[in-house]
Amino acid sequence: MSNESIKAEQDLIHEGVESEVSTEEASLIDELTQANFRIEELEQLLADALAKVDEQKDSVIRAAAEVDNIRRRAAMDVEKANKFALEKFANELLPVLDNMERALQGTNPQDETTKAIYEGVELTQKSLLTAVAKFGVKQIDPQGQAFNPDQHQAIGMQPSAEFPTNTVMLVMQKGYELNSRLLRPAMVMVSQGGPSQESASIDIEA
């Protein structure tokens, strides 16, 4: 076989090998391209799924917050309703307590003819005050105390040698508070004469 024939045969073999390699490379590139497309598609699906999860998570958080707000508002409404009902009840009860107070003031406990009435009214009043105290109703009786504009309403002022200046010398009508909140101020007469509180304290200590 001549050299030219051998060379021609080698060229054919080389071309065949290159053709097979090119075909395999093309097939591999095609597979890689499809794989990349599939990866991108899966990544997009994953991103969409994560976005939906975040959206649902936000919805759950918002729903939980709304439920919590509704419960809080409902609790506040119930509390306000209870306070309003209790305050209304206490205000309706004040005239009854005032009438008992006036009955005691107008009855002589030393008089045998009215002693039983006095004791009966006094016992009823104490029982009623004890009962309403369980619901936070407290009587304000500031006799002899310093005048407090937050709890007392001054009807007038009078000179007094017995009481220091700005001291409650007479309680015209007792006040009441509900759970430390003023229901009605005590109606009082205030001293405008006599020794000051400080002077009175010094005199007592002396």
Curated annotation (Swiss-Prot):
<dbReference type="GO" id="GO:0006457">
    <property type="term" value="P:protein folding"/>
</dbReference>
<dbReference type="GO" id="GO:0051082">
    <property type="term" value="F:unfolded protein binding"/>
</dbReference>
<comment type="function">
    <text>Participates actively in the response to hyperosmotic and heat shock by preventing the aggregation of stress-denatured proteins, in association with DnaK and GrpE. It is the nucleotide exchange factor for DnaK and may function as a thermosensor. Unfolded proteins bind initially to DnaJ; upon interaction with the DnaJ-bound protein, DnaK hydrolyzes its bound ATP, resulting in the formation of a stable complex. GrpE releases ADP from DnaK; ATP binding to DnaK triggers the release of the substrate protein, thus completing the reaction cycle.</text>
</comment>
<dbReference type="GO" id="GO:0042803">
    <property type="term" value="F:protein homodimerization activity"/>
</dbReference>
<keyword id="KW-0963">Cytoplasm</keyword>
<comment type="similarity">
    <text>Belongs to the GrpE family.</text>
</comment>
<dbReference type="InterPro" id="IPR009012">
    <property type="entry name" value="GrpE_head"/>
</dbReference>
<feature type="region of interest" description="Disordered">
    <location>
        <begin position="1"/>
        <end position="20"/>
    </location>
</feature>
<comment type="subunit">
    <text>Homodimer.</text>
</comment>
<keyword id="KW-0346">Stress response</keyword>
<dbReference type="GO" id="GO:0051087">
    <property type="term" value="F:protein-folding chaperone binding"/>
</dbReference>
<feature type="compositionally biased region" description="Basic and acidic residues">
    <location>
        <begin position="1"/>
        <end position="17"/>
    </location>
</feature>
<keyword id="KW-0143">Chaperone</keyword>
<dbReference type="GO" id="GO:0005829">
    <property type="term" value="C:cytosol"/>
</dbReference>
<dbReference type="InterPro" id="IPR000740">
    <property type="entry name" value="GrpE"/>
</dbReference>
<dbReference type="InterPro" id="IPR013805">
    <property type="entry name" value="GrpE_coiled_coil"/>
</dbReference>
<dbReference type="Pfam" id="PF01025">
    <property type="entry name" value="GrpE"/>
</dbReference>
<dbReference type="GO" id="GO:0000774">
    <property type="term" value="F:adenyl-nucleotide exchange factor activity"/>
</dbReference>
<protein>
    <recommendedName>
        <fullName>Protein GrpE</fullName>
    </recommendedName>
</protein>
